[in-house]
């Protein structure tokens, strides 16, 4: 027979206590008001000796061992069955001994087995033992009644205990967070020291999250703040380090998904994720995103991080070398903005294994700042049009005649002499490079006769890398873009060749081609303007990349989005909110902005508080940037020159924040821009006159 808890040894040491089983039975009978409990009745189910004297000399270890086995946790139904005879005998023995022994003697004998009786009674309360009917029907009814009463009492006790566990305190939550942090820190130390494999480590981490506040299934009645909880920030960092650096291989995709989902429910339990943020019931797995560092972000280490990046931009570029377009972006990363922590994103066009090793070295630099590397790079937002897509099919069956409506892949103004901002733009001779018309600037000459010739002039502005060329010093500019129109014309011509001559489809394509030719000829006869100045250079550690175009006097220039542009997702961009009325010099971190580019159209985002540092043209540069929100796309090729705008809060209209010049070419979620204040300051330094977005008033 298998022995539990060393009971057999205990019997040999205290063999003189021969009356213990009977006294134990007497105590159980008295606590249930002289009714025999069904569980306590299991003390000696295998006894076949009806002599009470023999019962007193029975092996105590055998008695308790049988009781434990009769309520085995390995039984599927957690119920065992005994013979009616054994039950009757045990009941008879209990009644016999209860009348022949005193309560004091019973208490004395129970002290030796006090640590044994408690586990047995606990098992009895949780797992009732169902018996077969014995010959003594009355005894069976008494046992059943007593068992029901005992179970009801124990059930209420468990319910009250569960209710008390749910009433957790804030101190207990912080203690649990601290314990979880310590466990995860130990796991991460083992990983970095090659003590444990990543596969085993992530399994242990998932189990630790499962054990966090196990009695609380729903949200806690408190709100935990990342700013005030160092343990929570460190936990977030470790999880993000798993997801962004250690589990990036496709072999860990399943482990990554499980950990991310467990982390999501962990944050939801702490009220860092609300139902409005994500709907978990939809079955869609949450994902990590990047967010801007706004004005309300008070996370520790933020000031220190900004100082490091500022010092980095002041370093001598001659002693630094990196991949073209590589960058360092300070952002927030997490599932939602409220659950995100400070993050340094390293973008590299050619990502290699040693870069991940570098992250391991930098891991301990900040205790609560996440670092990760990704394949990405900064590139100019001008578009280089490639080859025209072709089809393999020779012909297409004709369809019924209908009136065709073509929609060109660029904005077209209703009035060719009134061109709104944000239209496509290129030089007259460009074959590939195209960008966006940012807007219009007007010189404020005042009464100075030296600049009187410019008093009534209008100037368009865009990025210098879009319109400057080594072949021509002062190129003419076309709006819409000559590059896009020519490319569109080639596509239509190629597509028309797939239809038979005289068909309605081919006729429609050729008519559209003819309209494009007419528009191109009109633009060459009515030139939009000519580049008069531009530069792409590093001035005071900042990129100066813009050019001004003197617009032909026959064109009416207004800083408005125009009614002829494509519809916007924002329904408030109508009427007065189509006009740019103010320059924004004081940029507030987290400010909601948008741009309308010739390539991607309307996209929105938020201003980041800390600049992005990147390597381009053999120099280390920095720039303000926008983080896309709520969609993960902000800019792409062809958007260079687009103005960064925001809706004014105190009046109707739009505010001008800056001009887009670059973006991250791989993920396209960052938009780098030059503030309008820097542009106007540089123009004043070069031209010696003031500039504004509104025409100069007479007098």
UniProtKB/Swiss-Prot annotation:
Residues 8-18, 39-51 have a biased composition (Basic and acidic residues). It is found in: Cell membrane. Keywords: Cell membrane, Membrane, Zymogen. GO terms for cellular component: plasma membrane. Induction: Down-regulated after extracellular amino-acid addition. Its main location: membrane. Residues 61-78, 144-154 have a biased composition (Low complexity). InterPro entries: Peptidase_S1_PA (IPR009003), Peptidase_S64_Ssy5 (IPR012985). The propeptide is autoproteolytically cleaved from the catalytic domain but remains associated, forming an inactive protease complex. This processing occurs even in the absence of signaling. The active site is at residues 465, 545, 640. Component of the plasma membrane SPS (SSY1-PTR3-SSY5) amino acid sensor complex. Belongs to the peptidase S64 family. Protease component of the SPS-sensor system, which regulates the expression of several amino acid-metabolizing enzymes and amino acid- and peptide-permeases in response to extracellular amino acid levels by controlling the activity of two transcription factors, STP1 and STP2. Catalyzes the activation of these transcription factors, which are synthesized as latent cytoplasmic precursors, by proteolytic removal of an N-terminal inhibitory domain containing cytoplasmic retention motifs. SSY5 binds as an inactive protease complex to STP1. This is SPS-sensor serine protease component SSY5. The gene is SSY5.
